[in-house]
Regions:
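Eukaryotic scaffold repeat domains enriched in small/polar residues
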Residues: 4-368
């Protein structure tokens, strides 16, 4: 790549402030941001050659030569907000001497209700499955970055940088407890790259590789802190990891491991067909279909006028073969976020899209 092109891509990456898995420290694991050394925003960047994603994934690698034709458009708006602190608004912060922020994360609970982490306004914003506001819940930690809601309505909110703890909030909105992040398996808060719940167990992903069980949804910490080989997926049956094999060539790889017994199911190498700068989603729906979000540089992009998008891939749960892909617009404003895409239990994703006028929640299907 010519130096002028490299500089152009570096500048462009600065604009993609919403990539879920970016932050300023490159560590071994399973996610890679290209170009190497580019300024980054929030969640963890990791090396594709690190051991975290491959230590327990021994097995054959299947290589795909291409993907189904991309579906474009077709998103259905669920809710729209303005920027601000009042009702119907979500917070945005653009300080002179710190990273700008927008809502860090969103998730969906067992009832289909949407929870948005509006940390600038120190609250969770709750919507029904049709996008109607249901109220807010105070956030009791100082630097919240991720949220997960369990089947019984317990909300888990992660602060990995200041309090370095997971706040456990009951269905009544009152805090039930707090789980420390630091301990066996997690020596630094910044190494935490995702928050996950599996039944009553609470896991924190380390450097996009293994996940550490830090406690339970009752607020009780786990002293032993055992590890599992990847992030617990939403199907209840799979651990997942992903990595970028060759960013400029658009080659990525996904590994699935069965939970019981803990054995390798597949490793699938996929050719996206466009340069890949980062990954911003990895999960499975209730049926087991796996979703991988890739941030790509679009055809016609130049150093002077870079153009980016998100290619959302859906993969077969048994062997990882591509079932379809959908092209989404990339968020290019400078705000930091942590999880801008969340997989719906019934299939498809919700995307927290940002504009200068305000953010909106959009539902997308994957493929045709």
């Amino acid at each position: 790549m010519k130096r002028s092109t490299q500089l152009g891509v570096v500048v462009a990456v600065l604009l993609i402030g919403a990539s879920v898995w970016w932050f300023s420290r490159a560590q071994p694991g399973s996610i890679e941001l290209l170009p190497e050394g580019a300024p980054t925003v929030d969640s963890g960047v990791a090396s594709a050659t690190g051991s975290g994603a491959t230590r327990k994934t021994t097995g054959a690698v299947t290589i795909d030569g291409g993907l189904p034709e991309a579906r474009t458009g077709g998103g259905v708006e669920l809710a729209r907000f303005g920027w601000g602190s009042g009702e119907g608004n979500l917070g945005r912060s653009r300080p002179d001497e710190a990273n700008p922020e927008a809502p860090m994360s969103l998730t969906v609970d067992a009832l289909g209700q949407v929870w948005i982490l509006d940390q600038v306004n120190e609250r969770l914003v709750k919507l029904d499955r049709n996008g109607k506001p249901l109220g807010t819940v105070p956030v009791p930690v100082q630097a919240a970055q991720d949220v997960v809601v369990t089947a019984d309505g317990t909300a888990l909110v992660m602060d990995r940088l200041v309090d370095k703890a997971i706040a456990v909030i009951g269905p009544d909105g009152k805090q039930k407890g707090e789980l420390p992040i630091l301990g066996k398996g997690l020596e630094e808060g910044g190494a935490s790259t995702g928050l996950f719940a599996d039944g009553k167990d609470v896991y924190v992903e380390r450097e996009h590789g293994d996940s550490v069980k830090i406690g339970s949804t009752s607020g009780e910490a786990n002293r032993d802190r055992p590890e599992v080989p990847g992030r617990p997926a939403g199907d209840g049956r799979t651990y997942l990891t992903a990595n970028i094999v060759d960013g400029p060539s658009g080659v990525v790889m996904v590994t699935a491991i069965d939970r019981q017994p803990q054995q390798h199911r597949f490793t699938r190498q996929l050719v996206v067909g466009l340069p890949v700068l980062g990954l911003n989603a990895l999960d499975a729906d209730r049926s087991g279909v796996i979703y991988l979000g890739t941030i790509v540089e679009l055809p016609g992009s130049t150093p002077e006028l870079p153009q980016f998008g998100i290619t959302l891939l859906c993969l077969d749960p048994l062997d990882g073969r591509p079932l379809g892909q959908t092209r989404l617009p990339a968020n290019t404003s400078p705000e930091e976020t942590f999880r801008e895409l969340t997989v719906l239990p019934e299939g498809g994703v919700l995307y927290l899209e940002r504009t200068e006028q305000g953010p909106r929640v959009v539902r997308y299907a994957c493929g045709s």
